[in-house]
Amino acid sequence: AKGHGLIMVMGKGGVGKTTIAAALAVGLVQRGHSVHLTTTDPAAHVQSQLDGSLPGLKVGRIDPRAETQAYIDKIMATRGKALDDAGRALLLEDLQSPCTEEVAVFHAFSRVVNEARTAFVVLDTAPTGHSLLLMDATGAYHRQMTQHYQGSAGGAMAKHIITPLMRLQDADMTHVVIVTLPEVTPVSQAAALQEDLRRAHIEPWAWVINKSVAATGTSDPLLQARLAGEQKQCERIAQGLAQRTFVLPWLTEPPVGVEALGGLVTADGLLSH
């Protein structure tokens, strides 16, 4: 690894994104890197997954409510400074729009993407629908910026701007990891997510198949139907969907704590690439 970059862990709710993100972050720290592990998922419990602290690992979250309030405060302190009371009241009313949260979260996301220029950032994303809204905002900002700069100074500035979307499209900078379960519906949903990303010219780096019973090595006859179904989905992923595939076994206890999380990526080989 070159010492910096963004790893985005994506997928539907309930597939184990937070676990995979935490394991990747711990694995990178154990290899001597400084890492910022953060999440856009309001329901994620990244800190409880780690169950402690680790030197070199910073844990944070993009909290939509806090980011929105900070954004409103900033706009009121800058744009609202020169306004009278009536003008400030109107501006504040405008800022109560649902769009404000989208903009505020996008700005926070952009800061995280920018941070990955000099350090490792592992981003545990919100479930697919929320994440695609964030991707839409990222795309809209990119179009707005390129149009703005193409229209000024003969378009010369447009060649020099680098938007967050361009960083996500840069395979040297960003690795998108899609997490799924070895079942028909989760795999189909992950495939749809991948198509959405590809439309934005973002190519997923790898898929992680989580909670695989087959990977436990069991030969229990009661599980044969389950194993056959898993095998079919794993083949579907490997043969036509993923550039790289990593399989994690079904565990009786979820991996909690630095040791268990670090062992997860070591056993899987996910960080040896």
Locations of regions flagged by a protein language model:
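A conserved catalytic-core segment of Leloir-type glycosyltransferases
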Residues: P55-D85
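Conserved catalytic network of the ASCE P-loop NTPase/AAA+ motor domain
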Residues: L28-R31, G52-L54, V113-A116, L168-D172, ...
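C-terminal lobe/tail of nucleotide-utilizing enzymes
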Residues: A1, Q169-M173, L181-H273
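Switch/connector loops and helix/strand junctions flanking conserved nucleotide-binding motifs
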Residues: H45-S48, E67-A70, G129-L134, V187-S188, ...
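Generic enzyme active-site microenvironment
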Residues: T39, V122, V208
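Walker A/P-loop NTP-binding active-site region of P-loop NTPases
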Residues: M8-E67, T125, L134-H142
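Phosphate/Mg2+-binding loops and adjacent switch elements
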Residues: K81-V184, Q189-A192
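Pre-Walker A (Motif I) flank of P-loop NTPase domains
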Residues: K2-I7
